[in-house]
């Protein structure tokens, strides 16, 4: 029986682990016999071994500098080698301090060898996966302990009984995530995330010239508790990295959710457009704009107020106004009142809009900012009442009004009452604009849809939209199902609507504060000392 081994070139005196991959290789054309058992041995770099987990093709180089491609498909159980040269037959190996991944042919786990294309299929992957799991787990465990040794000493003996017991008492550096990796090997999400994170850690250590990545957020992400994943959504990241020796390799990671880990979310924000990572601590100072592609991500109402209003001039109105389930809406999943309470705790708001008085570059204004994080910014009776009171207050004080829209439309849990808010706000706006001749600026952010678009969102004297904002009355899916027609992509983005005359201007966030200020000055509003009236707080 001939053997084909995966040589990781890992020179570790303390770690020796063997797991053999055996297959009759009589017809494997270009690959010569270099191993001790007469079978060919393929040389892999450590990082390339980690990449075996991904269903992707990656480039490898042997010690002679010759390169070839390897494809490993877990789902279809295919391992394929595509050499760029005829140099695979001359590979030589060192027999000590190396890790092998071998799987015996006892259970016919490997069959249907294709000599022409140099690939074989795995029919029974149970042995293959279990032994690959064991080797990979041992490598990661050893690496974590080795990197921590630069800070403090640790017991060098790490027996299988210690690992299987799951006890933390025997070793203060016990890594529960690494332990759990063995038992969640069939979970593709955990596998991809763990490997992707570890590779990123290795990249950081290479680029910094250091041999430890304990300071890296990725390292703490791998070797820590409390890791959770979700199956919603997907994304892909491809990175090309060059090492100090000049060799390069490709890493392709998969993220199955923008919020797949709480720790990662606290440190990084992933762009919805290009999937680039933005450092969270600097993200607010960048106004939630992606540094890589310039995409405008969603902002909370509090961040909007901080961006738009001069510091120390914000005076909120009607903060205690809350909904009391006016139509007693009942849902099989979750009662409406419970949902309201849940969103109030999550967003820190009483409802989907904040209204108040402030100054914009010294000019007193009345401003309302909707928050999409609160039930999708849906417009219920509280939202309608707060905006109506804001406009009426602006009429009494002759203030310009700015409303920042971010809404999914009317709130279905309040039925006809939510629809009546459209008429109520529009009536107040008519009195403000037509009778009092005051100035109203509407700012549309992504998304602005439904009843908000059909009412006060489009009633501004000046209508400003953010770049790439999703502005529509009905969503794309609703239109397609209603009309039974395919809607072209990009039909409901701000740029398309702007060319059709729906908006007056598209303004990025950086100069957004200055544009309304110039408009107010043009219409006769100037800086002045302003003392806001004490607002009436109504609880319903």
Swiss-Prot record:
Q: Which UniProt keywords apply?
A: ATP-binding, Chloroplast, Fatty acid biosynthesis, Fatty acid metabolism, Lipid biosynthesis, Lipid metabolism, Metal-binding, Nucleotide-binding, Plastid, Transferase, Zinc, Zinc-finger
Q: Which segments constitute the CoA carboxyltransferase N-terminal domain?
A: 267-538
Task: Identify which cofactors the protein needs according to its UniProt entry.
Answer: Zn(2+)
Q: Some GO term, biological process aspect, for this entry: which one?
A: malonyl-CoA biosynthetic process
Please name the SUPFAM superfamilies in this protein's record.
ClpP/crotonase
Q: What are the residue ranges of zinc fingers typed C4-type?
A: 271-293
Enzyme Commission no: 2.1.3.15
HAMAP family membership: AcetylCoA_CT_beta (MF_01395)
Q: Protein name, please?
A: Acetyl-coenzyme A carboxylase carboxyl transferase subunit beta, chloroplastic
């Amino acid at each position: 029986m001939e053997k084909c081994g995966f040589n990781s070139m890992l020179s570790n005196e303390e770690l020796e682990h063997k797991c053999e991959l055996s297959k009759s290789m009589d017809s494997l054309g270009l690959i010569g016999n270099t191993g001790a058992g007469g079978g060919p041995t393929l040389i892999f770099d450590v990082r390339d071994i980690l990449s075996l987990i991904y269903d992707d093709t990656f480039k490898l180089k042997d010690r002679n500098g010759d390169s070839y491609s390897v494809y490993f498909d877990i789902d279809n159980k295919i391992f394929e080698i595509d050499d760029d040269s005829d140099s695979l037959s001359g590979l030589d190996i060192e027999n000590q301090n190396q890790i092998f991944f071998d799987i015996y042919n006892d259970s016919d786990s490997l069959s249907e060898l294709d000599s022409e294309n140099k690939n074989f299929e795995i029919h029974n992957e149970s042995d293959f996966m279990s032994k690959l799991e064991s080797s990979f787990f041992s490598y990661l465990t050893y690496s974590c302990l080795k990197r921590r040794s630069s800070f403090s000493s640790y017991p060098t003996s790490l027996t299988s009984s210690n690992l299987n017991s799951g006890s933390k008492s025997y070793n203060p550096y016990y890594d529960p995530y690494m332990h759990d990796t063995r038992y969640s090997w069939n979970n593709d999400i955990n596998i991809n995330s763990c490997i992707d994170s570890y590779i990123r850690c290795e990249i950081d250590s290479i680029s910094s010239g250091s041999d430890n990545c304990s300071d890296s957020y990725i390292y703490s992400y791998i070797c820590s508790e409390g890791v959770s994943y979700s199956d919603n959504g997907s994304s892909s990241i491809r990175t090309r990295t060059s090492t100090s020796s000049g060799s390069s390799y490709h890493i392709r990671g998969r993220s199955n959710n923008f919020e797949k880990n709480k720790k990662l979310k606290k440190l990084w924000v992933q762009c919805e457009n290009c999937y680039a990572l933005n450092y969270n601590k600097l993200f607010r100072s960048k106004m939630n704009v992606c540094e890589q592609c310039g995409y405008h991500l969603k902002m909370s109402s509090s961040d909007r107020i901080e961006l738009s209003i001069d510091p120390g001039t914000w005076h909120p109105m009607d903060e205690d106004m809350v909904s009391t389930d006016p139509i007693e809406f009942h849902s099989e999943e979750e009662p409406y009142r419970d949902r309201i309470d849940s969103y109030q705790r999550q967003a820190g708001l009483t409802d989907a809009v904040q209204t108040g008085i402030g100054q914009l570059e010294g000019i007193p204004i009345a401003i309302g900012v909707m928050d999409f994080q609160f039930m999708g910014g849906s417009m219920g009776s509280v939202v309608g009442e707060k905006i109506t009171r804001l406009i009426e207050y602006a009429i009494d004080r002759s203030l310009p009004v700015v409303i920042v829209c971010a809404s999914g439309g009317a709130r279905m849990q309040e039925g006809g009452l939510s629809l009546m808010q459209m008429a109520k706000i529009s009536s107040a706006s008519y009195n403000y604009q037509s009778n009092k001749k005051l100035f109203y600026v509407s700012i549309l952010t992504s998304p602005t849809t439904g009843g908000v678009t059909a009412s006060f969102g489009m009633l501004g004297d000046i209508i400003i939209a953010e770049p790439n904002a999703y502005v529509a009355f009905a969503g794309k899916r609703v239109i397609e199902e209603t009309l039974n027609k395919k809607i072209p992509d990009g039909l409901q983005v701000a740029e398309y609507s702007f060319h059709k005359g729906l908006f007056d201007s598209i303004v990025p966030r950086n100069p957004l504060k200055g544009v309304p200020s110039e408009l107010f000055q043009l219409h006769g509003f100037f800086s002045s000392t302003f003392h806001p009236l004490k607002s009436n707080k109504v609880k319903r």
